[in-house]
């Protein structure tokens, strides 16, 4: 018997910064030993970011499971952050959020969606490539971090 899940996507509001921070810190904690420091999303000021960027929450059976942060640029949509709660990872919710970003881009007449990630987050890079993204460039970005820039059509 397959369990049914109620999945809702809701745009976050300015008062949701604490929930964004909590979920993001939980989601990225596993990467601290891999890269030797907290990934950039763990250190962001979400009280300020939510005023400038779009955040969408994904709820599963009423529980906050994941979020995506996007930024409308002049010619593309930038995915700034995708965070999935550890208890919901590996269940396709990150893919759902990536598909949501594609819809947001299309509704803004953008032909591209871009994102940046630390190349040491290998399982994330593999997921993005499976979703149709291609590596645009690699190199040191902010603070000497080895980054990977990906773009999707």
Give residue ranges: language-model regions.
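Acyl-donor-binding surface of acyltransferase catalytic domains
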Residues: 1-3, 152
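Short coil/turn segments at alpha/beta junctions that flank glycine-rich nucleotide-binding fingerprints
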Residues: 2, 91, 107-111
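Acetyl-CoA-dependent GNAT
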Residues: 2, 11-81, 85-87, 95-104, ...
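Generic structural signal for residues in well-ordered beta-strands
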Residues: 7-9
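C-terminal "cap" of GNAT-fold acetyltransferases
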Residues: 44-47, 55-56, 111-131, 137-153
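Active-site acidic-Proline motif in GNAT/NAT acetyltransferases
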Residues: 85-91, 119-120
